Amino acid sequence: MSVKWTSVILLIQLSFYFSSGSCGKVLVWAAEYSHWMNMKTILEELVQRGHEVTALASSASILFDPNNSSALKIEVFPTSLPKPEFENIVTQEIKRWIELPKDTFWLYFSQMQEIMWKFGDIFRNFCKDVVSNKKLMKKLQESRFDVVFADPIFPCSELLAELFNIPLVYSLRFTPGYVFEKHCGGFLFPPSYVPVVMSELSDQMTFMERVKNMIYMLYFDFCFQIYDMKKWDQFYTEVLGRHTTLSEIMGKADIWLIRNSWNFQFPHPLLPNVDFIGGLLCKPAKPLPKEMEEFVQSSGENGVVVFTLGSMITNMKEERANVIASALAQIPQKVLWRFDGNKPDTLGVNTRLYKWIPQNDLLGHPKTKAFITHGGANGIYEAIYHGVPMVGIPLFADQPDNIAHMKTRGAAVQLDFDTMSSTDLVNALKTVINDPLYKENVMKLSRIQRDQPVKPLDRAVFWIEFVMRHKGAKHLRPAAHDLTWFQYHSFDVIGFLLACVATVIFIIMKCCLFCFWKFARKGKKGKSD
């Protein structure tokens, strides 16, 4: 047989192998904003590898347009909440979160709690709209999906996985106080050296900082999400027709893919069914648009500064915009500022405003000297990947923590958005640009980020395919999920051992008393004789 025909037969065999054995069907409970950006990167790679991906999204979803052509299949389910109203709620609640008073612990977190409860009610209604839609549920059941993929910060996917009896893979950045990670995933975060997320602490804590960390942990564990989780418990119990809890159903997840990495996160124990996939969006820079490239090149040896506060921040107050613009006008670098609003009066000739910028491509440009960021995880990972020091102006959620982590690593300077002056911003930029330590530190983080045997995206895809191939990954799931809280902490064993010790001590004491009584009685009898 000729080499030509041998090659043809081998290709045919390979095509049969990949078409029949390797391609799976993935059901996705869609997320919003940056959560969806990360998930979409994984899903597009799955499609490239021949898998069929169906994203389940509500008619109110902000990022989904069913008319847009996409490799992903979009299954839109109707909901009573109109899209413009949902978008307005998100905008208003995020604005409210940003403006919360940060100087009072109880006031800040109690109001943040109300915001989370409001979103919880909305997403619970979305979930009700899905499971009550018999036609849709029948269609999904008949599709015979191999795995459900979701971000657990938007609950419901675990209910679908339970109803359809299929494996579940999570992709998560964090939940406030690590509540879902600990209560549902069984993660370990010893408060003695692992700072609670949103505490802005490092892993090198003083005694009083450990006290603060413990207070944060107790608050998040016993107060923050309890009310909302009980609502989910009740809803899941009604749907499944048996008593259950959100923690129990979420705890059945086969794999947790955490969008973090060890050059970003402080070290802590990990379970076998947990893997880090931080930096999914990091990639080599592409050429800039012609007009933008010309502006960057015009900066000469001074280089450029990239500035963005993210896609969720619009209509910045005029006073704050002018303070920032005034500061940027005082530096020798050219500035590319992602800004959606009226042009500030103090805008300098060295600054250009854009409604959108190719952030990754700009950060990867050799003339970029610094990155002014709100501290979103995606932006920080891109800055680390390309080795760009940062000036952090965190606004809400995990952003203060993210910047605090970079500050601890010596890769960033942190400012307060509400109180910073033009001088503060100028000095911060001069520090990260002119002090070589910041560049050295972020380059060290960059080398660590790039020095991985398997890329984060490939690891994420591997685990999803692994779960599809093996119909789950229960062999990696710790038995801790099957224990009650007192069994998990061995309180029953400790109680039993204490009871045994107490019994032995009691018997010894009784024997001693009996012997003492015997000897005392014998002594009295001898004296009387």
Swiss-Prot record:
Name of protein: UDP-glucuronosyltransferase 2B23
Pfam assignment, any one: UDPGT
Role, per record: UDPGTs are of major importance in the conjugation and subsequent elimination of potentially toxic xenobiotics and endogenous compounds. This isozyme has glucuronidating capacity on 6 steroids and the bile acid, hyodeoxycholic acid. May potentially play an important role in estrogen and androgen catabolism in peripheral steroid target tissues.
Signal sequence annotation: 1-24
Glycosylation site positions: 67-68
Record keyword Membrane present: yes
Catalysis: reaction(s): glucuronate acceptor + UDP-alpha-D-glucuronate = acceptor beta-D-glucuronoside + UDP + H(+)
Organism: Macaca fascicularis (Crab-eating macaque)
Transmembrane segments: 494-514
Family: Belongs to the UDP-glycosyltransferase family.
